[in-house]
């Protein structure tokens, strides 16, 4: 039988004499409890964990307590039941910070803002994701174009102002370097609903893209990687069926939402690897 796990639990702890002190640890996000007397003295409570825990793990937090996985429709109801007045003798008491349903993402960023160094030690992967989001939002809020627009840049803007379709890939070609391709690519990618990639292996690129599958995408190909342009990824993004095989294989379908794809490169497309009719070439 699979082990029962949950982030939300209710508990009862019988006692005699003085009210016991509950030894909550850093795994507990929030707890509320009160002294009740229905035939005998006991503590009735609700606990919200930071991550899913098994029954055995919960019993280790409060030895001797009877635990059950939350059965209420939501955590608000379970919390209210644990603090009901009709059977209360003393309390209620609270520990930690309660996270309402639907607010998890906001609370994670609040934790990051409150103490990024603690998160860096506790969960380095989560810290890096929060840092990435924060830095992107900061750059996006201050992004400005302080240069005169070149004709090819005007042409790109005209192309992306049109409604995207399922085929056209905008390919910005500048063989010499110094035309402003990368500067313009970075600027475009800071627009809301846009993402940036420098190319790379299929599984890495699609893992990143699957995090924001509805984005328009800018691919800024370094000169050193010009002969390794990943045409398969470009087509998957345009076709709106994306297969991410990294860590956990998933298929993302977004058939009714075409997006723009722009490639900035020092080379022309290799038409042995992609259909010529897909390409809208913009010369720098």
Curated annotation (Swiss-Prot):
The record's GO CC annotations read:
host cell nucleus
How, per the record, is the cofactor bound? Divalent metal cations, possibly Mg(2+) or Mn(2+).
Tell me which residues bind a divalent metal cation: 36, 42, 86
TM segment ranges: none
Entry-linked InterPro entries = CRESS_DNA_REP, Helicase_SF3_ssDNA/RNA_vir
Please report, in chain numbering, the residue ranges of the motif RCR-2.
42-44
Specify the superkingdom: Viruses
Note what the entry says on domains.
There are 3 rolling circle replication (RCR) motifs. RCR-2 is probably involved in metal coordination. RCR-3 is required for phosphodiester bond cleavage for initiation of RCR.
Q: How does it assemble?
A: Homooligomer (Potential). Rep binds to repeated DNA motifs (iterons).
What protein is this chain from? Para-Rep C3
This chain is encoded by the gene named: C3
